[in-house]
């Protein structure tokens, strides 16, 4: 297992080499105890560390809550005109987390996951639901391959603020790119102002 500094240096070098933003999921030791932290870490195209989000909902059915320290706050980062909020795997099942980010101005969610094939229909449905109810872009990034317990079928995708799937990937490792229309978020929120009815 790589030490945090090694993982961060690796990700920083990728962002510099390809001149891209990098948002990646990593597991790192917790400085205060024997547990670990599940993080989404963000680097800009110059390789600079921008920040990290710590998973707020460890996956209790598999005992993550016994070995991973629970995050205490949401995070939103300004990236290329968007307010990006990272989400980690099981977090996707908790709509209140998304709403907390919406209150902070989020309009783009990136969900990094190890979502097994046996529940892939949940993955599809929840990604679309989070996009629709928050009138935001949702990018779902899921692993492929297998481990001793599960097969993983990928199915990474991008859902726009209206709930339309604008990009879908299959069950193998792939790299793809597309453009997101920042104006679509504002246009749809103005046309159908659901978020104005959120109650405190």
Regions found by a protein language model. Name each.
Residues 2-24, 93-176:
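CN hydrolase (nitrilase-like) catalytic-core segments centered on the catalytic cysteine
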Residues 177-200:
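Short, basic/aromatic-enriched C-terminal tail that caps enzymatic domains
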């Amino acid at each position: 297992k790589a030490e945090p500094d090694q993982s961060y240096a690796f990700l920083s070098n990728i962002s510099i080499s390809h001149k891209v933003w990098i948002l990646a999921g990593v597991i790192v030791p917790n400085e205060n105890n024997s547990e670990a932290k599940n993080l989404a870490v963000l680097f800009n195209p110059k390789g600079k560390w921008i920040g990290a989000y710590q998973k707020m909902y460890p996956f209790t059915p598999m005992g993550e809550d016994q070995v991973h320290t629970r995050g205490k706050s949401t995070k939103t980062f300004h990236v290329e005109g968007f307010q990006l909020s990272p989400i980690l795997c099981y977090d996707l099942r908790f709509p209140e987390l998304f709403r907390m980010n919406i209150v902070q101005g989020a309009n783009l969610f990136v969900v990094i996951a190890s979502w097994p094939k046996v529940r892939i229909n949940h993955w599809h449905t929840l990604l679309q639901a989070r996009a629709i109810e928050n009138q935001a872009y949702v990018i779902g990034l899921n692993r492929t391959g297998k481990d001793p317990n599960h097969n993983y079928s990928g199915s990474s995708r991008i859902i726009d603020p209206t709930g339309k799937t604008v990009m879908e990937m299959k069950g193998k490792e792939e790299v793809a790119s597309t453009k997101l229309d920042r104006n679509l978020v504002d246009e749809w929120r103005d046309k159908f102002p659901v978020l104005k009815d959120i109650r405190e």
